[in-house]
Amino acid sequence: MNLYNAVVTAAAKESKDKGVLVAMNGLILGAQSTVKMNTVDVQTFQAPNSGALGYVLNGKVFYNQVTLKKHTTQSVFDVTHLNALPKVGIVYSYSNIEADMVTPMLNNGYKGIIHAGVGNGNIHQNIFPVLTDARQKGILVVRSSRVPTGPTTLDAE
């Protein structure tokens, strides 16, 4: 049924200009908001921060809301002039993480480091100086959270 609903959604004139969509379990989700919430659950794909955009019923699509985020060709991520994506590392942080888990990224051609922290994207004191050093070397550092919903806030450390 998911494949059928996906085809119905893609073919529907109502889906035009809605960006990339996910049609699963009778729902229509915006791809930017879709998260896999469970390792084995059949209804694992959800949009916990925004909810479903609509649903498919009896071969017809019904939209309840629209996405306000820029998407597809209007996205802020323009990669049309890139020949290759930059080398970016992801640090899955945890309590008492050691600096040597991050230090190799500073001298091996990384252009960015994504810090996937606990809670509000918290950075453990052991690696804070290494990430500061990375910034001083021109490496972009992004603080994120492994928690599937909610933002990371400024000045959380």
Predicted regions located by residue number:
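Short, glycine/serine-rich, charged loops/turns that create anion-binding
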Residues: 27, 95, 148
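Short, glycine-/small-residue-rich phosphate/pyrophosphate-handling segment
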Residues: 1-34
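Accessory alpha-helical/coil subdomains and C-terminal extensions
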Residues: 30-115, 120
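C-terminal non-catalytic interaction/assembly regions of soluble proteins
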Residues: 120-157
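Short, glycine/charged-enriched secondary-structure capping and boundary segments
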Residues: 1-3, 35-38, 105, 128-130, ...
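Short coil/turn connectors at secondary-structure junctions
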Residues: 14-19, 24-25, 49-50, 85-88, ...
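Short beta-strand segments
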Residues: 21-25, 92, 116, 144-145
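Predominant activation on well-ordered alpha-helical scaffold segments within soluble catalytic domains
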Residues: 4-11, 54, 128, 132
